[in-house]
Amino acid sequence: MVQLNGSYKLEKSDNFDAFLKELGVNFVTRNLAKSASPTVEVIVDGDSYTIKTSSTLKNSEIKFKLGEEFEEDRADGKKVQTSVTKEGDNKLVQVQKGDKPVTIVREFSEEGLTVTATVNGVTSVRFYKRQ
């Protein structure tokens, strides 16, 4: 069984700018986001999950229980209702509702974390190495 708890450092991004553009993030913020190299920390405590993302651009944190809806500030600055479910032992699927629904799939492995985010058919894949 793959351990979800841990710290992960961004190594590579594919199509991240196009994803942010489709989401409605402005040019300046997109360029800052592309140059940032975030660290993601995942903490699982019983049935409670915390995902902290830290970078020179911005820090964010979401806390949730699987299947329970919560409010979150999306990358475009909008507040949206979000829920997260678990598929198998190593995959978290996050759905952000709103004018532009977003699906974020976090797949964990011994080596790291792959984050696949999709909005309006535009998909970005980001690869993080386990620290």
Curated annotation (Swiss-Prot):
Signal sequence residues: none
UniProt keyword annotation of Transport present: yes
Main subcellular localisation: cytoplasm
InterPro entries for the chain: Calycin (IPR012674), Fatty_acid-bd (IPR000463), ILBP (IPR031259), Lipocln_cytosolic_FA-bd_dom (IPR000566)
Record-linked SUPFAM superfamilies: Lipocalins
Superkingdom field: Eukaryota
Annotated (5Z,8Z,11Z,14Z)-eicosatetraenoate binding sites: R106, R126, F127, Y128
GO biological process annotation, one example: long-chain fatty acid transport
Sorted UniProt keywords: Allergen, Cytoplasm, Lipid transport, Lipid-binding, Transport
Binding-site list for (9Z)-octadecenoate: R106, R126, F127, Y128
Cellular localisation: Cytoplasm
Entry GO MF terms: fatty acid binding; long-chain fatty acid transmembrane transporter activity
Pfam families: Lipocalin
One GO CC term, this protein: cytoplasm
Domain notes: Forms a beta-barrel structure that accommodates hydrophobic ligands in its interior.
Family listed: Belongs to the calycin superfamily. Fatty-acid binding protein (FABP) family.
Described function: FABPs are thought to play a role in the intracellular transport of long-chain fatty acids and their acyl-CoA esters.
PANTHER family: FATTY ACID BINDING PROTEIN
Protein name: Fatty acid-binding protein
Species of origin: Tyrophagus putrescentiae (Mold mite)
